A protein has these predicted regions:
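An amphipathic, aromatic/His-enriched active-site/gating alpha helix that lines ligand/cofactor pockets
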Residues: 25-38, 56-90
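Residue-level signal for secondary-structure boundary sites
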Residues: 15-17, 61-63, 99
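Short, structured interface segments that constitute the first stable element of a domain
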Residues: 5-7, 16, 25
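Short, surface-exposed ligand-recognition loops at beta-strand->loop->(often short) alpha-helix junctions
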Residues: 10-20
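Short, well-ordered beta-strand segments in beta-rich or mixed alpha/beta enzyme
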Residues: 2-9, 40-67
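Glycine-rich beta-strand-turn "strand-cap" elements at beta-sheet edges
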Residues: 40-49, 76-103
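Short, flexible segments with low predicted structural confidence
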Residues: 1-3, 18, 34-36
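Residues in and immediately flanking transmembrane alpha helices
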Residues: 21, 51, 71-72
Length: 103
């Protein structure tokens, strides 16, 4: 089952070049992983310091393998230096699902 992973980060001002370089390296690392399909980076119109990365993976297992990868953890630690708060993650399944109705 395809999954979309939303990764939300808010960065401190004044480090755009360093952040952009790290994000490019981060994306390149993900692109070489089994199960990676695509990714995009969005900048909030209301708060330009907030970024939303949307990654598409073949499965939750593929995403979790990348999330636990040591190289990814090093990239994450480098990004955290420039962040204003913790990284937030949300996972979504792609496609029609049955929603439980409590009525």
């Amino acid at each position: 089952m395809l999954v979309k992973i939303h990764i939300r980060r808010r960065f401190k001002e004044g480090h755009a070049k360093q952040i952009q370089a790290l994000l490019r390296e981060f994306r390149a690392g993900a692109m070489n992983r089994e199960g990676y399909i695509s990714g995009e980076t969005l900048i909030s119109l209301e708060d330009p310091q907030e970024l939303l990365v949307i990654g598409t993976w073949e499965s939750m297992d593929a995403w979790e393998r990348w999330r636990e990868n040591e190289a990814r953890k090093r990239f994450e630690a480098m990004l955290e230096i420039y962040q204003d708060g913790p990284t937030q993650y949300e996972a979504f399944a792609l496609g029609a699902l049955t929603i439980n109705d409590t009525d």
